[in-house]
Each structure stands twice: as C-alpha cells, then as structure tokens.
C-alpha cells in the first residue's frame, strides 16, 4: 500500500472558488469509499479506522463502502478494523476486487448483511491464524494458547456472520481454503456477485 501511495494520481476540480486538486483516494473518500489495498498491518489499520470514524462523524446513517484487495496480514490489525466496523453506526458495505485472503476475507464477511459483494474474478481464501514466535519453551506454550484462542474466536465469528456451523468453518479453515466467488456466496462470506456497478452502490 505504501508503494502504491507513492504513485497516486491527482484529480483537479473546478468550482466557483477556483481550482482544487485532490489525490484520488481523498477524492473517493468524499464519496465514502475506502480502499484496503495490500497487506494488513498497523499502519494500514490505523488509516482505515481513522477513515471509518471520520465518515461516521460526517453522517452516521449513510453507508460507507470498503473496497478490499488484500492478501491478509496481522490478526491484531485486522481485529482493530473489524471492531471499528462494528462499533460505528454507519453501515459498512464490503466489496472484494482482486483477492480477499486470510484477514482480508475476514473483513469482507464482516460487512453489513446483504451488502457484502465480490467482483466475478475475485478470489477468496480462509484459513486458521498462524504464528512464528521463538523463545523459551514456556513462553512458546503461552503464545500457542493465545493462537488457539484467536483461532477459536475467528472461527466463531466466521460462523456467526456466514450462517454456518462452527464445526463447518473449523474443518474448512484447517488448511488453506481457496474459494471462487460462487463458492464464497454458497458459504455465506458474500451476499452477491457484482458484474456491473448498481446505481445504489458507491
């Protein structure tokens, strides 16, 4: 995302007060569109959370549109975005363009029910969280228990949001599980597949 932001085009608008220029993401933010593009980390999470809170302050009833193209990333950073999406009053509509893997798919399915969508050639991946802690054996056991609890929490939330049983998602997430958009629709991660933008969409 940081590399992408270095190549951001500018948009110039004319008004009665003269000419104003915006980077493309700022201009889209005015339309209540937020991009999650690239790996999920603390920096990206802070930016997305700040934009969610800003748009809610502007209008707590008007939908926010979160466009996702992400391979996933840090679980804690993803949970920060998930909790913020649930915390704000404005409904968050999610759309996968490209891919939504790991924490990306978690955020995709966390959108407002009925508004979670994907483009036809998007790909979606679910799996259990992983960790790479090194250190003393006693500390490794502590971290292993934390990962186990995180896995349980994520599995439960997938099941709740998607209308499936805990056991179904526990089995599906045991290894990397790639899905087409049609499979994601059947599993309840999304509500629809969009080929053309609808008038009501952002």
UniProtKB/Swiss-Prot annotation:
Key words, A-Z: Cytoplasm, Hydrolase, Protease, Serine protease
Cited CDD domains: S14_ClpP_2 (cd07017)
Active site: 102 (nucleophile), 127
Keyword Cytoplasm: yes
EC number: 3.4.21.92
Highest taxon of the lineage: Bacteria
CC annotations in GO: cytoplasm; endopeptidase Clp complex
Pfam families associated with the record: CLP_protease
BP GO annotations: protein quality control for misfolded or incompletely synthesized proteins
InterPro entries found in the cross-reference section: ClpP (IPR001907), ClpP/crotonase-like_dom_sf (IPR029045), ClpP/TepA (IPR023562), ClpP_His_AS (IPR033135)
Subcellular compartments: Cytoplasm
Entry similarity comment: Belongs to the peptidase S14 family.
Its job: Cleaves peptides in various proteins in a process that requires ATP hydrolysis. Has a chymotrypsin-like activity. Plays a major role in the degradation of misfolded proteins.
SUBUNIT field: Fourteen ClpP subunits assemble into 2 heptameric rings which stack back to back to give a disk-like structure with a central cavity, resembling the structure of eukaryotic proteasomes.
HAMAP family tied to this protein: ClpP
Name of the protein described by the UniProt record: ATP-dependent Clp protease proteolytic subunit 1
Gene (UniProt): clpP1
């Amino acid at each position: 995302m940081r590399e992408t932001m270095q190549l951001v085009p500018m948009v110039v608008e004319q008004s009665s007060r003269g000419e104003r220029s915006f980077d493309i993401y700022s201009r889209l933010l005015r339309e209540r569109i937020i991009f999650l593009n690239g790996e999920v980390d603390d920096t990206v999470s802070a930016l997305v959370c700040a934009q969610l809170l800003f748009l809610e302050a502007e209008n707590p009833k008007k939908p926010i549109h979160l466009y996702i193209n992400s391979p996933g990333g840090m679980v804690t950073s993803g949970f920060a975005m998930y909790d913020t999406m649930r915390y704000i009053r404005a409904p968050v509509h999610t759309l996968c363009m490209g891919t939504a893997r790991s924490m990306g798919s978690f955020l995709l399915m966390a959108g407002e029910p009925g508004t979670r969508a994907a483009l036809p050639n998007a790909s979606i991946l679910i799996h259990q969280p992983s960790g790479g802690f090194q250190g003393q054996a006693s500390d490794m056991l502590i971290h292993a228990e934390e990962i186990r609890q995180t896995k349980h929490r994520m599995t439960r939330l997938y099941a709740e949001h998607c209308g499936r049983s805990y056991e179904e998602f526990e089995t599906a997430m045991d290894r990397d599980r790639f899905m087409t958009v049609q499979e994601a629709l059947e599993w309840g991660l999304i509500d629809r597949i969009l080929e053309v933008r609808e008038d009501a969409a952002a």
